[in-house]
């Protein structure tokens, strides 16, 4: 169904996609864990030397369990799972939650027939619900994650063609995460070892809270808050 933001969900080639209908083009996104791009990153993406791996504390001997409170299409969770981390995910936007559920199911089906290593990765990923704040507040102390990972939506600064298509679609679907500051506070109380916040490189600190340290790339950075 098309709503006032001209968004709709539609089936394309037997997979669920979210589409933005414009006058000149059609942008669509889906959760795809079987693409050549995803496989390339699995094989040659830098392994445990990637910034996200360093940010969560992954090492040759340690693969922490991670709670991804803002899973989106599952891209970062998949990277961490491919490196050995058990990842529990939540995604609160119903349309995006549906895309992620569909993508995981299709990947399991495809992997069962074509790639058992993909199945092994997917077994380390669990989508448990939609409300991250409530979920974190109900976790028993003994089962709290070592790492909580946050990638809150941030204001779109440009409408240029360089903006990733999924961001164009998502920004039309949902507004800036107005409760991201609260989510950080809950995450700090939930995580056993650290909270990692992914941010645009030049964005202010979430909730104005300076991290213990940060890792910076060309466009993004990871703010790391250590829990004591």
Which residues make up each language-model segment?
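Single conserved hydrophobic/aromatic residue that forms the stacking wall/gate
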Residues: 1-12
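SAM-dependent Rossmann-like transferase core, predominantly class I methyltransferases
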Residues: 27-60
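Conserved class I S-adenosyl-L-methionine
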Residues: 61-72
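Conserved acidic residues
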Residues: 64, 146, 193
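Conserved SAM-binding loop of SAM-dependent methyltransferases across substrates and taxa
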Residues: 73-85
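S-adenosyl-L-methionine
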Residues: 90-147
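Mobile active-site "lid"/loop adjacent to the S-adenosyl-L-methionine
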Residues: 152-183
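Conserved Class I SAM-dependent methyltransferase catalytic core
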Residues: 180-226
């Amino acid at each position: 169904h098309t709503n006032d933001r001209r968004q709709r969900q539609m089936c394309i080639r037997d997979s669920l996609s979210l589409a933005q209908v414009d006058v000149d083009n059609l942008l669509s996104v889906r959760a795809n864990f079987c693409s050549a791009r995803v496989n390339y990153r699995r094989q040659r993406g830098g392994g445990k030397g990637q910034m996200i791996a360093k940010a969560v504390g992954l090492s040759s001997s340690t693969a922490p369990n991670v709670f991804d409170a803002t899973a989106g299409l599952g891209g970062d969770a998949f990277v961490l799972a491919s490196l050995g981390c058990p990842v529990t995910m939540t995604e609160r936007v119903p349309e995006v939650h549906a895309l992620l559920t569909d993508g995981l199911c299709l990947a399991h089906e495809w992997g069962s027939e074509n790639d058992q290593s993909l199945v092994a990765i997917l077994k380390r990923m669990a989508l448990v619900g939609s409300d991250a704040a409530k979920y974190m507040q109900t976790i028993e102390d003994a089962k709290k994650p070592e790492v909580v990972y946050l990638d809150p939506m941030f204001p779109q600064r440009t409408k240029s063609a360089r903006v990733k298509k999924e961001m164009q679609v998502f920004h039309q679907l949902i507004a800036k995460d107005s409760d991201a500051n609260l989510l950080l506070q809950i995450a700090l109380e939930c995580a056993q070892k650290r909270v990692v916040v992914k941010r645009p490189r030049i964005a202010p600190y979430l909730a104005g809270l300076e991290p213990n340290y940060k890792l910076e790339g060309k466009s993004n950075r990871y703010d790391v808050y250590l829990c004591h």
